[in-house]
């Protein structure tokens, strides 16, 4: 296995594997950072030195989990592996650009880690708001390194998005309409469009911040006629689509997993699912200011953003009830991916309901920047995106490796993880309703109980992460080969065996369309 195979790869399967390994590694780093946060908050009083180092850890935790764990795994890993197989394409449309998309990430990660090590680190929160992120409150190179890190990660994602859009539209057999491609392919397509439209706005915002810090411009400085609120609009115009970018591929995965383990040949309401994803993608761009209800917008502006945000619940509800309808009447196989998928549906819905609460601008004035918000977005990320990743991994592991995971161990792992994340994040709703603010390393004694419970939950999640590594080792050590795969007629990624050959569909796929 020459080193060139991995450094110069133009093969979608190899690049997908690189993304998965990188994402798993970054996930360990992000988990370590989250445990530092929960250790600090496990008791009143100080563990680390001060709020600056605490906020550096919080900021790094967010960036690592979003840009180096969830996105590389869902889009780069499963997207690369599955999209070409699902549409019968020999590879991605631009295989070398695909390689570059991946190799921009390790330098980007390096820059982010470097930012923590110079001066006092970037303790700005992931939104990097000026004036805190300006050159007075954050003198030194920390924030600049963070900005360059984001630039690289952004270029990587934009190139990946171009690649996925071209591949999904252009590389499928001519006889097949877009409405005959699997839902995961659709989810990656919608995600890629969101990336392509939102990331340039982030790039503009952080570039202006860079020049404010180093070239004496005043885009975000009132002293020179600028406005820090402009930065917030630019950031959240990216930031809100970003959260849908994180969850949409998960929606696609859950559709596949639920249909497969219900013994159905397709999910319920295919067209409804597709349109729901497109609606979520569109609406995701016109709700950004709900992150800014406390900055003093007009009451009519707040009314609009409240209503628009609530409308997103409709296509999301279409998806949730379609998953439940897919289960209906099926012969359900209670295998581990199905457990992850059912956990996803329930916990994502809980997270969505707290999101509806927060969409009310009047309520959000009180709940903004409290642990209620932290609980909300960790329910949709730590139990939405992560559960989708786990469902996908356990479901497609035999396809990726040719080996099967130990079914009992993976079920125990699911149970431990389920208890861990819920024990970590459910109490945070109580803290938020008691007005405990985010981004502080210490708190009054009144909040001690639920913080201690939350920190114990984080240790249970750590046990789950270690169990997962053991399960992975066990599968490769035991080498149980795949015997047979069911439902391949409607799950075409499995058609070439486990694992598929290095090159698939070297000749164009022959497709016969049944006319109804």
UniProtKB/Swiss-Prot annotation:
One of its GO terms (molecular function) is heme binding. Its EC number is 7.1.1.9. Binds 2 heme A groups non-covalently per subunit. Binds a copper B center. Residues 1-11, 87-94, 171-182, 262-269, 328-335, 401-406, 479-516 are mitochondrial matrix. It is an enzyme of class 7 (translocase). It holds the Pfam family COX1. This is Cytochrome c oxidase subunit 1. The lineage of its organism: Eukaryota, Metazoa, Chordata, Craniata, Vertebrata. The gene is mt-co1.
């Amino acid at each position: 296995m020459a080193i060139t195979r991995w450094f110069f790869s133009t093969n979608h399967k190899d690049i997908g594997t690189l993304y998965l390994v990188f994402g798993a590694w970054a996930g360990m780093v992000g988990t370590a950072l989250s445990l530092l946060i929960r250790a600090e908050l496990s008791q009143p009083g100080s563990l680390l030195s001060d709020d600056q180092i605490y906020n550096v850890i919080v900021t790094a935790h967010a960036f690592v989990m979003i840009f180096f764990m969830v996105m590389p795994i869902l889009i780069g890993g499963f997207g690369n592996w599955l999209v070409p197989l699902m549409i019968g394409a020999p590879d991605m449309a631009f295989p070398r650009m695909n390689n570059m998309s991946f190799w921009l990430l390790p330098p980007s990660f390096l820059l982010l880690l470097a930012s923590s090590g110079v001066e006092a680190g970037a303790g700005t929160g992931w939104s990097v708001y000026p004036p805190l992120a300006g050159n007075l409150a954050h003198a030194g190179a920390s924030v600049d390194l963070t900005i360059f890190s984001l630039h690289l990660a952004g270029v990587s994602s934009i190139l990946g998005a171009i690649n996925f859009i071209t591949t999904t539209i252009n590389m499928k057999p001519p006889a097949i309409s877009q409405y005959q491609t699997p839902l995961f392919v659709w989810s990656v397509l919608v995600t890629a469009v969101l990336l392509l439209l939102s990331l340039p706005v982030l790039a503009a915002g952080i570039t202006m911040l860079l020049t404010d810090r180093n070239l004496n411009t005043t885009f975000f400085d009132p002293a020179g006629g600028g406005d820090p609120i402009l930065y917030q609009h630019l950031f959240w115009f990216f930031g809100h689509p970003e959260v849908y970018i994180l969850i949409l591929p998960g929606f696609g995965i859950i559709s596949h997993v639920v249909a497969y383990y219900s013994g159905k040949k397709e999910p319920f309401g295919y067209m409804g699912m597709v349109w729901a994803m497109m609606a979520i993608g569109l609406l995701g761009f016109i709700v950004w200011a709900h992150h800014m209800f406390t900055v003093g917008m007009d009451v009519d502006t707040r009314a609009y953003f409240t209503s628009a945000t609530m409308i997103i619940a409709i296509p999301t509800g279409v998806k949730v009830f379609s998953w439940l309808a897919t289960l209906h009447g099926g012969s359900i196989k209670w295998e581990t991916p199905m457990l992850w998928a059912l956990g996803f549906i329930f916990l994502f819905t809980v997270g969505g309901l707290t999101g509806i609460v927060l969409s009310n601008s009047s309520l959000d004035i009180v709940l903004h920047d409290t642990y209620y918000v932290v609980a909300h977005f960790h329910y949709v990320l730590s139990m939405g995106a992560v559960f989708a990743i786990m469902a996908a991994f356990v479901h497609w592991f035999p396809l990726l490796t040719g080996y099967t995971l130990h079914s009992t161990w993976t079920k125990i792992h699911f149970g431990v993880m389920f208890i861990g994340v819920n024990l970590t994040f459910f109490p945070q709703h109580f803290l938020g309703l008691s007005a405990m603010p985010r981004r502080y390393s210490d708190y009054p004694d009144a909040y001690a109980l639920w913080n201690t419970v939350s920190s114990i939950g984080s240790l249970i999640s750590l046990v789950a992460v270690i169990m997962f590594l053991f399960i992975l080792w066990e599968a490769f050590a035991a080498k149980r080969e795949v015997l047979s795969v069911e439902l391949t007629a409607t799950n075409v990624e499995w058609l070439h065996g486990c694992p598929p050959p290095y090159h698939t569909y070297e000749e164009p796929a022959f497709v016969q369309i049944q006319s109804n």
